[in-house]
Amino acid sequence: MSWRGRSTYRPRPRRYVEPPEMIGPMRPEQFSDEVEPATPEEGEPATQRQDPAAAQEGEDEGASAGQGPKPEADSQEQGHPQTGCECEDGPDGQEMDPPNPEEVKTPEEGEKQSQC
């Protein structure tokens, strides 16, 4: 009893978009602001030309002064209670390889191991 329903796949019609018309040859003068930064005039202060390292130091000082102990770390640990069967990554944060089946000892009938 094999019933084949009608396929719902329908190819979309292709749309052809015409490329924009060329007004004229592009000259480097048209995009010179992107290549060279604009030089400030004599009457304007050069606020954008500050040393980036000095600006970075100012941001770091403000960020470190307002921070106290991080409460997020404590709340994350309390949010996940340990059930006694926690499979964790290795000490480097990488997954551990599965044990070699030849080295694994099978539990005796009286002993049971918890499996994750």
From Swiss-Prot:
It holds the Pfam family GAGE. Residues 102-116 have a biased composition (Basic and acidic residues). Residues 1-116 are annotated as: Disordered. It comes from the Eukaryota. Residues 31-44, 86-95 have a biased composition (Acidic residues). InterPro entries: GAGE (IPR031320), GAGE_fam (IPR008625). Not expressed in normal tissues, except in testis, but expressed by a large proportion of tumors of various histological origins. This gene belongs to a family of genes organized in clustered repeats. They have a high degree of predicted sequence identity, but differ by scattered single nucleotide substitution. Their sequences contain either the antigenic peptide YYWPRPRRY or YRPRPRRY which is recognized by cytotoxic T-cells. Belongs to the GAGE family. This is G antigen 2D. It comes from Homo sapiens. The gene is GAGE2D.
